[in-house]
A protein has these predicted regions:
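Short arginine-rich
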Residues: 152-156, 186
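Glycine-centered loop/turn positions within well-structured domains
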Residues: 147, 155-157, 165
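Flexible, glycine/small-residue-enriched loop-and-beta-strand segment within the central core
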Residues: 51-61, 66-135, 162, 170-171
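Hydrophobic, membrane-inserted alpha-helices
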Residues: 45, 65-67, 143
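Beta-rich strand-turn-strand
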Residues: 127-142, 147-151
Length: 194
């Protein structure tokens, strides 16, 4: 087994980091083979305490994906690669309960289709953000803490607010953005070859 030291915190000892890395692999195996067997994963995944994956959802997780504490994944989601998700982030359905049917209580309402949420490569989602189902979060996106994302986000944009809106582009120029997207593609191409 090759341990990836790129993500090692400053000041951490290599031995301690290696032990924690291996323990995480064991914990991930337990989570996705015994506790949440409906979740499919492909690569290194770090799941902090009290994060939950709702039963019956179609959830797939790529390589180098980290979930902070108390995250709640309660909709169909495809997580690609190299994703950081801070604590208390929620992925929720868009149409969990129909509320616009005259003469029917919300409690008794039928459930609508929520769609599949796609989180592309190299995404960072801030603390307590809420992601509504059926959207695509593009490559290289940063989502601010507390944001409520209700629509698709294009590659390399920074979004925040309630509801979330574009704050700015992640990179100053289009050529920097294109260079970064080529870099992401090159990483994925190399991963497929290995």
């Amino acid at each position: 087994m090759k341990i990836d030291y790129h993500n090692m915190p400053k000041g951490a000892g290599m031995t301690t980091f290696a032990i924690r890395y291996i323990m995480n692999i064991v914990r991930t195996w337990y989570l996705f083979h015994l506790k949440y067997p409906w979740v499919k994963y492909n690569g290194f995944v770090r799941v902090m305490a009290h994060t939950t994956f709702a039963r019956g959802m179609k959830i797939s997780i790529g390589h180098n994906v980290q979930f902070g504490e108390y995250c709640n994944i309660a909709s169909d989601v495809v997580f690609k690669n190299n994703i950081l998700i801070a604590g208390r982030v929620c992925f929720v359905g868009r149409n969990d309960h129909q509320f616009d049917t005259v003469g029917e209580l919300i409690w008794n309402s039928s459930r609508g289709y929520n769609g599949i949420t796609i989180v592309e490569d190299d995404v960072w989602i801030g603390h307590s953000a809420t992601i509504v189902g059926g959207i695509t979060i593009g490559k290289g996106v940063v989502i601010a803490a507390g944001a409520v994302v209700t629509q698709d986000i294009q590659d390399c944009e920074i979004w925040g607010g309630v509801p979330a809106k574009k704050i700015k582009d992640r990179f100053s120029t289009i050529s920097e953005k294109e260079h970064h997207l080529r870099y992401i593609k090159r990483i994925q191409d190399n991963k497929r070859k290995n």
